[in-house]
Amino acid sequence: VTAVGSFGYFISPIFTNYSLIEYGWNYTLFLFSLFLVTGLIAAFFVRSPKDNEIIENRSDQSLKEALSEALESKSYILLISGFFVCGFHITLVGTHVPKYVMDRGLEDWTAAAILALIGLFNIFGSLLSGYLSTKISKKFLLSVIYLLRGFSIAFFIFTPPSVLSAFIFGASFGFLWLSTVPATSGIVAHLFGTKFLGLLYGIVFLSHQIGSFFG
């Protein structure tokens, strides 16, 4: 699901840059509104499995007990903290890189290309992360992803500005963009089961969005 969503992120910067230049922001916003309506219509056709017991733990644990167990877990708190940093990274790059690129003397299309590359390579990064999550330690995988993100950002900041370095950054950071999601959700499911996975992962994702706000 994450990989497919990234395809939209790949198309969006290219389409937006072209539409803003050719038709202006009014028409561009109208088209994005149509895309949003299409997504809302599709959501009405999503159906839950007929037998929820297939995907839930057979447990009599209450919601209060699940929350208490999670919030007392050091691993869960660290996961929340890590996803805060993830959200900070995501918005920092998505919001400030376009202006940063132009401030360093590159043309504005370079920023759109970076964002498009992020979306494109995130398709492969998310798929690989999901696969590796079933083969190696999810905690180790998540640590490596965050470490490589730091290297990718440092490379972009400290290397001389060029189209090549911008493209390398877009591809490398895109590969790591949302590759944290499969490992993170997998860790939550491994620690606490799937009965309250939606809520417990939702809390982790809330931390991600708070990090995005500060980014």
Label each region the model flagged.
Residues R47-E65:
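Flexible cytoplasmic inter-helical loops of multi-pass small-molecule transporters
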Residues A3-F7, F84, A116-L120, L147, ...:
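Transmembrane alpha-helical cores of Major Facilitator Superfamily
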Residues F10, G87, T91, G174-P182, ...:
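Small-residue-rich segments within alpha-helical transmembrane domains of MFS-like 12-TM solute carriers
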Residues V1-V4, I187, G193:
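Cytoplasmic helix-loop-helix junction between adjacent transmembrane helices
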Residues V4-D51:
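Helix-loop-helix hairpin linking two adjacent transmembrane segments in secondary transporters
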Residues Y9, L178, L191-G215:
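A late C-terminal transmembrane helix in Major Facilitator Superfamily
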Residues P13, L71-Y131, G215:
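Extracytoplasmic gate region of multi-pass secondary transporters
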Residues A116-N122, L128, S133-I187:
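C-terminal transmembrane helical hairpin of 12-TM major facilitator-type secondary transporters
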